Regions:
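Phosphate/NTP-binding elements of NTP-utilizing enzymes
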Residues: 1-203
Length: 203
């Protein structure tokens, strides 16, 4: 999800002048990694693969035109664009104003640094306008306690109900439904799980 959101931020920043995006991550290293993906995607807009198709060539030409019109100035924590748009990464981003905010791994932050988690909500999230977008994606670290769990539980209770522009819309993408994570079971012996994992999946 975070790579998709990073590419969406790049797209919105290129085609909307003065559009400000923020990436809040559990560590600055993780946040700057996402900035690196955005920078790589921008640099690759005019990439032509070996044995290109007509579509490849057309996309590369479009990318060349975009890069000619809108230049990017990347740094470790920020990508600034010549159209006034900007993408910034940090661990709380308090004091900034964003139209699009991605909060990654709030479960981890809430479990290990609850005061910083509260600051993310009261500072960065509350500074996003009501017509802005906040994407909050996280594992379930911390279990059934902490700020992330409270927010997730509240959004789960709203599933199927009318939502205002200020309500969270809940999406769940379970990792165990990804075929890449399946183990091949032996027909003769099957596959068994330790008791703690069985309890995890039952919860």
């Amino acid at each position: 999800i975070s790579t998709y959101v990073a590419m969406l931020m790049l797209d919105m920043s290129l085609f909307r002048p003065n559009f400000h995006c923020g990436i809040i991550d559990k560590t600055l290293v993780d946040g700057t990694g996402k900035i690196g993906k955005i920078e790589l995607a921008y640099r690759s807009l005019d990439y032509v693969p070996d044995a290109p198709t007509e579509e490849d060539l057309a996309l590369a030409e479009l990318g060349r035109l975009i890069k000619g019109e809108i230049q990017a100035r990347p740094s470790k924590t920020t990508v600034s664009f010549s159209n006034g748009s900007k993408i910034t990464a940090g661990t709380s981003l308090r004091g900034g104003t964003f139209q699009f905010l991605h909060v990654s791994e709030l479960g981890y932050v809430a479990a290990h640094a609850p005061l910083r988690a509260r600051e993310i909500v009261t500072g960065a999230m509350n500074a996003v306008s009501k017509d802005g977008v906040i994407v909050r994606e996280s594992t379930h670290e911390g279990g059934k306690f902490g700020l992330n769990y409270e927010m997730t539980k509240a959004s789960m209770e709203m599933v199927g109900k009318p939502l205002s522009s200020l309500d969270w819309k809940f999406f769940f993408f379970p990792w165990w439904k990804n075929p890449e994570y399946f183990l091949e079971a032996d027909d003769e012996h099957g596959c068994s799980f330790p008791e703690d994992l069985q309890k995890y999946f039952e919860d």
